[in-house]
Regions:
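Acidic (Asp/Glu-rich) sequence patches and key acidic residues
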Residues: 1-118
């Protein structure tokens, strides 16, 4: 199983969210501990994790931590070698690249876009 990320906005007047733009970032569930420890996020699967403008800075911090001190997070790597520090750092880079694209393409939605883990 893997975590797939999407950026969504709420449909006005309806209890529904629709995906906007493209986020191709995904990673194995085995990376959960590394993600949570490096970002401080709760990382709630199959739901809205808050506004992107609040979540993205925590992912930026997590990436810096993984790049500056990868050995600190090695203990959280999965025994099956699927959830690695290196892979998680690349996952964060993919999210950040897709968010940068989103900001350029959908400037008017940046403040209302939500971060979904599916």
């Amino acid at each position: 199983m893997s975590y797939d990320i999407s950026f969504k906005v709420k449909v006005e007047g309806v209890d529904a969210y629709v995906p906007v733009g493209a986020c191709d970032a995904n990673i194995t569930w085995s990376a959960r501990k590394i993600i949570k420890k490096s970002t401080g996020l709760k990382w709630k699967n199959c739901q809205n994790n808050g506004l992107c403008v609040d979540v993205i800075p925590k992912i930026e911090v997590g990436l810096r931590k993984l790049e500056q001190n990868p050995d600190k997070f090695k203990e959280y790597e999965a025994p099956n070698e699927w959830g690695t520090v290196k892979g998680t750092a690349q996952f964060f880079r993919n999210i950040l690249n897709d968010w940068n694209d989103f900001q350029q393409w959908y400037e008017e939605l940046v403040q209302v876009a939500t971060f979904w883990i599916e």
